[in-house]
Regions:
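Walker A/P-loop NTP-binding motif
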Residues: 43-58, 78-82, 255-257, 292
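Conserved helicase NTPase motor core
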Residues: 7-37, 44, 63-64, 71-72, ...
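Short glycine-/polar-rich loops that comprise or flank the Walker A/P-loop
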Residues: 57-61, 96-99, 137, 260-263, ...
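Conserved helicase C-terminal RecA-like lobe
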Residues: 181, 185, 237, 368, ...
Length: 689
């Protein structure tokens, strides 16, 4: 690291020259920071925010947009620590650098929509439905319109929601979305348009917003010049992390808030744009400088603090073949004689055995399991490895699978909380009521119809005559409703009441109730960290914990376990040793993502992201064949694979290539006497004489 000038403030002296240039850049001018993998992006962004605060900026007028709630919390802690250290703890004072406006686009959107609800014609008590509930509501509308009974297969509810979401987030016409991403459903264009109109009406009737609405309503509000000016004037500085993973709607929001770019800083890496399946577009970061006149300034962070130079040389070569990118070659002061490995194996079984052998070998050499990770393109690619890990009794945690909040019992409890927060949330009420014995879809619908037309929802519930089978459980539901519908229902004790009410239903509905009850205890602990029921529901819907995250019970911190993860879930992480599975065409790139140049380039970036997670050791495994099941007329069979096109021959000198298992050594054997020659053809003829 180059030495800082003698008069450089102490809090800037730990930064390298590129980082200092980014941190101290003119605050008013628009700025793009291209931050390569492992280049200290988070530290640089935190220092820039702290530098603004130390320069006199009001932290309450700084908007920080991050990719996750956890990232926002971590960024806030770093900023406060930097400011505290710069001013001294005594001078700082409580809350001197507290960022009151930091979070994801969706979380900030939800907060602003509640503040401007009256102006926007929204109910301030609107609830936010998660993807599962949104799909269920889509299905209700689909059924009401008679689309589920079509002779020619109409898309399923999840597919309908995906199409709707893609249209909203890409801001592309429905016809174009169907043509590019869902061509098999192009024949249903008019029916889908009618379905989506009905879906919007249903949400408005129930006073619920889905995940996409938080951005859509925010963007629509900003389309009104007076509102755009009012919202934009709240913030002197807007900083955006992970800008390469934003979609067209988010970019539109940003430009509406700061149309001249004043006080706007975005940070990201075009080489790590891997979320197109969510509607993200790499064009946002590639086109950012040209959005302003004069063009936005750009600072590139190229010094990597994570990986060894041989790993970076290989990763640079892979991404260097991209069709379009910002020129950036990562470098490191961490030298090593060890090149990354390309390991060719026979099949998936050998791949699993190789990875396990390497993991155990490195563990014996002192590398803990927690310092090692296995990465793969799709969640099902690790199936064979998981079997081998279980067989060898190696503990592991998998990221990228079922989410914590997707568990039935967790969704049940959250539905009750949501319904009693907003009794007109029909999907939450539908799920909650059917927890009672003897209450089916028809009875639940009658209850919700009564609630919908009533001035006081609680009175409608108290007036409803419960079916005989639910007579015993109905009073408990009414008591819970009276408590939680009260104007000042205390939190988090309100959540504890819901869990206590649900406990007998849990035992009646599930054989494994004790294990599920432990999840609900964990959820109680999570609820206790939020100031209000509204904040709890909003944050958990927008940024749910993984099934294997700290919030939902991974192995104890003093235990050692291996990490398995999809590449998407591994973004932002690092390990000393990384193993990349299935580096073959058909898996990487996925055979479902080879339709356009844009899709191919995103798959290339996925491999790059996987490679740059490794600090010291990188093993890329190439199985030569796969056993596939139920493939058309050919049945179960072996198919042969070729090394991924992203590792062409020209980059191979940067790797150490080998096969596994190695061929057995050839032992010296005594010379053999020549074998006799046989006339088998003659013998075959003689058989018929």
């Amino acid at each position: 690291m180059d030495a800082a000038a003698p008069d450089t403030p102490a809090y800037l002296s730990t930064l390298n020259p590129e980082q200092r240039a980014a941190v101290t850049h003119e605050p008013a001018a628009p700025l793009l920071i291209i931050a390569g993998a492992g280049s200290g992006k988070t530290n640089t962004l935190a220092h820039r925010v702290a530098h603004l605060v130390l320069g006199g900026a009001d932290p309450r007028r700084i908007l920080l947009l991050t990719f996750s709630r956890r990232a926002a919390s971590e960024m806030g802690r770093r900023v406060e620590r930097i400011v505290d250290q710069a001013l001294g703890m005594q001078a700082c004072g409580a809350g001197r650098a507290a960022l009151t406006w930091s979070g994801t686009f969706h979380a900030i959107g939800a907060r602003l929509l509640r503040e401007y609800a009256e102006t926007l014609g929204l109910s301030p008590s609107f609830t936010i439905c998660d993807r599962g509930d949104a799909a269920d509501l889509m299905n209700v509308v689909r059924h009401d319109l008679g689309l589920s009974a079509q002779a020619s297969r109409f898309p399923r509810k999840e597919t309908c929601l995906s199409i709707y979401s893609r249209v909203v987030n890409t801001q592309a016409p429905l016809e174009d979305v169907l043509k590019q991403w869902f061509p098999r459903y192009a024949m249903w264009t008019d029916a889908l348009r009618g379905l989506f109109a009905g879906y919007v009406q249903a949400k408005q009737k129930q006073q619920v917003l889905d995940y996409d609405d938080l951005l859509l309503y925010w963007a629509q509000a900003l389309a009104e010049p007076a509102l755009a000016q009012d919202m934009g004037a709240r913030f002197d500085h807007v900083l955006v992390d992970e800008y390469q993973d934003t979609n067209a709607l988010q970019a539109a929001i940003l430009l509406a808030l700061k149309p001249d770019g004043r006080g706007l800083t975005v940070v990201g890496d075009d080489a790590q744009s891997i979320y197109a399946f969510r509607g993200a577009t790499v064009r946002n970061i590639l086109d950012f400088p040209a959005q302003f006149t004069p063009a936005a300034d750009m600072v590139t962070l190229s010094q990597n603090y994570r990986s060894t130079q041989p790993i970076l040389a290989a990763a640079n070569a892979v991404i260097g073949l991209a069709a379009e990118r910002y020129t950036k070659d990562l470098w490191s002061e961490r030298g090593s004689a060890e090149k990354p490995e390309i390991v060719v194996v026979n099949d998936e079984a050998d791949q699993a055995r190789y990875v396990v052998e390497q993991i155990l070998s490195r563990r014996e050499a002192g590398l803990a399991l927690l310092s090692q990770a296995v990465l793969f393109r799709a969640a099902d690619h690790s199936a064979q490895l998981e079997i081998e890990l279980v067989r060898r009794n190696i503990p592991f945690v998998k990221f990228g699978g079922l989410k914590f909040l997707e568990s039935t019992h967790v969704k049940d409890v959250l539905a009750v909380v949501r319904w009693l927060e907003n009794p007109r949330d029909r999907m939450a009420g539908f799920r909650s009521l059917q927890l009672l014995p003897g209450v089916g879809p028809k009875t639940a619908a009658r209850v919700l119809d009564a609630v919908e037309i009533a001035t006081e929802p609680l009175f409608a519930l108290e007036s409803f005559e419960a079916p005989p089978a639910a007579a015993e459980a109905w009073p408990d539901l009414l008591a819970l409703a009276r408590s939680l519908m009260a104007p000042a229902a205390p939190w988090p004790s309100a959540f504890e009441q819901v869990v206590a009410w649900y406990q007998p239903h849990l035992e009646r509905l599930h054989d494994d109730a004790p294990a599920r009850a432990a999840d609900l205890q964990q959820l109680e602990r999570i609820a206790a960290t939020y100031a209000s029921r509204e904040r709890f529901l909003t944050e958990l819907t927008l940024d749910p914990p993984d099934a294997s995250s700290d919030e939902s019970g991974v192995p104890l911190r003093d235990e050692d376990y291996l990490i398995l993860s999809t590449i998407h879930s591994a973004k932002g992480q690092e390990w000393k040793a990384v193993y990349v599975l299935n580096a073959v065409d058909g898996c990487m790139p996925s055979d479902l993502a080879t339709g356009t140049t844009e899709e191919i380039e995103e798959e290339r970036r996925l491999l790059y992201v996987a490679m740059t997670r490794a600090r010291d050791h990188l093993d890329i495994v190439v199985p030569q064949r796969f056993y596939v099941h139920q493939q058309t007329a050919y049945g179960d069979r072996h198919v042969y694979a070729s090394r991924t096109r992203f590792l062409p021959n020209r980059v191979m000198p940067l790797f150490h290539s080998r096969s596994w298992p190695p061929p057995p050594p050839v032992a010296d054997a005594p010379a053999k006497a020549p074998l006799p020659r046989l006339d088998l053809a003659g013998r075959m003829r003689d058989m018929w004489k």
